[in-house]
UniProtKB/Swiss-Prot annotation:
It catalyses: chlorophyllide a + oxidized 2[4Fe-4S]-[ferredoxin] + 2 ADP + 2 phosphate = protochlorophyllide a + reduced 2[4Fe-4S]-[ferredoxin] + 2 ATP + 2 H2O. It comes from the Eukaryota. This is Light-independent protochlorophyllide reductase subunit N. GO terms for biological process: light-independent chlorophyll biosynthetic process; photosynthesis, dark reaction. Keywords: 4Fe-4S, ATP-binding, Chlorophyll biosynthesis, Chloroplast, Iron, Iron-sulfur, Metal-binding, Nucleotide-binding, Oxidoreductase, Photosynthesis, Plastid. Protochlorophyllide reductase is composed of three subunits; ChlL, ChlN and ChlB. Forms a heterotetramer of two ChlB and two ChlN subunits. PANTHER family: LIGHT-INDEPENDENT PROTOCHLOROPHYLLIDE REDUCTASE SUBUNIT N (PTHR39429:SF3). Its EC number is 1.3.7.7. Belongs to the BchN/ChlN family. The gene is chlN. CDD domains: Pchlide_reductase_N (cd01979). Pathway: Porphyrin-containing compound metabolism; chlorophyll biosynthesis (light-independent). [4Fe-4S] cluster binds at C22, C47, C107. The keyword Iron applies.
Length: 435
């Protein structure tokens, strides 16, 4: 295990293994976000079973994704990859007529060295439908990094010329990260109140409406797991990244807006009052967790942002387990975490990259946190040991960005604690961790 000290934050790295939800699950929210798309996941039966269970979409609902199941002939190279993928894509074009087809590579395509990037341009030219290749294998990527690889591939497809004149009063700003439409509207309106116009969003609702990206444009991310997309936008598209904390919680949202305003030399107005009003409205939830402790085992790369928000709510964060940490992309978030700990006068949590779950269980046994935020695999065993847990995957699918959605975060965090209080009040102490 390696340990790195950085500005009073302690970074550790343990096993080098990923203990996370599979990154191909990004299909579940991206196919809904990009309305004219079709996602083709190229993998084995295991991938198919996972998608069926993770998404829970009935087959007669005709979702805009499918599984290209690799068979013995594919793995032994007896079948022609181009011919098989051509047959599937022509069928997709005939049945669904999408504006774009995404090929999602898996662990198996990585192991057998299937040349998806080489096949895609030839097939795209033949069938006249854009084919975007993204690797989302669990060997190299953690849970939410599946979205990162898709957006990084899409960033290279964004147009570079305007068909209408840009009338923005400032250098265009493009935001990146997949969020539900109501949250997108909220964040766009918050920036508009400060006089900042959002020129585009990656991903857009339709592939045919991808934002124009030119050299010198500003870009800002809304999620902490999009480091590859940020790198692609800076290096390939020559944009300027606004390094801001992420708009998760009232404190993060205010800091995100203030940082963007500072880049455009705009003095933000009303943010302090807006943040205070939100905190006041959350007091009924905060009272339940103030003074309690939380331990993050690590799963979705949202851990640092959530830990910072919960620290501001009065919780003590013992450890932040995280599958992968890009310290440059998350520099502003880490700085805000440090200043939050200083303001709240609490200890700095240890950040453990690629944590060893066995070691974590030992630390949980010693520390006895009031709540453990963990992947689904460990929730039931921890509950059996009398430890309150919350699935980290729920934070991925919930609306947690912006000022008004902070209540949803606390709704999730406090649910196990409220459940125990309710059981105790009913006299069912045998089922309660309070008893």
């Amino acid at each position: 295990m390696s340990i790195v000290q950085s500005d009073a934050l302690t970074f550790e790295c343990e096993t080098g293994n990923y203990h996370t939800f599979c990154p191909i699950s990004c299909v579940s929210w991206l196919y809904q976000k990009i309305e004219d798309s079709f996602f083709l996941v190229i993998g084995t039966k295991t991938c198919g079973y996972f998608l069926q269970n993770a998404m829970g979409v009935m087959i007669f609902a005709e979702p805009r994704y499918a599984m290209a199941e690799l068979e013995e002939g594919d793995i032994s190279a007896k079948l022609n990859d181009y011919g098989e993928l051509r047959r599937l894509c022509l069928q997709i074009k005939k049945d669904r007529n999408p504006s774009v087809i995404f090929w999602i590579g898996t662990c198996t395509t990585e192991i057998i060295k299937m040349d998806l990037e080489g096949i895609a341009p030839k097939l795209e030219a033949e069938i006249r439908v854009p084919i975007v290749v993204a690797r989302a294998n669990g060997l190299d990527y953690a849970f939410t990094q599946g979205e990162d690889t898709v957006l990084a591939a899409m960033a290279q497809r964004c147009p570079s010329h305007h068909y209408i004149e840009n009338t923005n009063p400032h250098v265009p700003l493009v935001l990146f990260g997949s969020l539900p439409d109501p949250v997108v509207t909220q964040l766009v309106m918050e920036l508009k109140k400060q006089g900042i116009i959002v020129s585009g969003w990656l991903p857009s609702k339709r592939y045919t409406e991808l934002p124009v990206i030119q050299e010198g444009y500003y870009v800002a991310g809304v999620n902490p797991f999009l480091s590859r997309t940020a790198t692609t936008l800076m290096r390939r598209r020559k944009t300027k990244l606004i390094g801001a904390p992420f708009p998760i919680g009232p404190d993060g949202t205010r800091a995100w807006i203030e940082k963007i305003c500072s880049v455009f030399s705009i003095k933000p107005e009303g943010l302090a009052e807006r943040e205070k009003d939100i905190w006041d409205s959350l007091e009924d939830y905060i009272a339940l967790i103030r003074g309690k402790s939380v331990f993050f085992m690590g799963d979705n790369l949202l851990e640092v942002s959530l830990a910072r928000f919960l620290t501001r709510c009065g919780m003590t964060v013992y450890e932040i387990g995280i599958p992968y940490m890009d310290k440059r992309y998350q520099a502003a978030e880490l700085a805000l975490l440090k200043s939050t700990c200083d303001d709240m006068n609490v200890m700095m949590p240890t950040i453990v990259e690629k944590p060893d779950n066995y070691n974590q269980l030992d630390r949980i046994r010693d520390l006895k946190p009031d709540l453990v935020i963990t992947g689904m695999a460990h929730a039931n065993p921890l509950e059996a040991r009398g430890i309150n847990t919350k699935w980290s995957v729920e934070f991925t699918f919930a609306q947690i960005h912006g000022f008004t959605n902070a209540r949803d975060i606390l709704e999730l965090v406090t649910r196990p604690l409220r459940r125990n209080l309710s059981l105790s009040e009913l006299g069912w102490d045998i089922y309660s961790k309070q008893g």
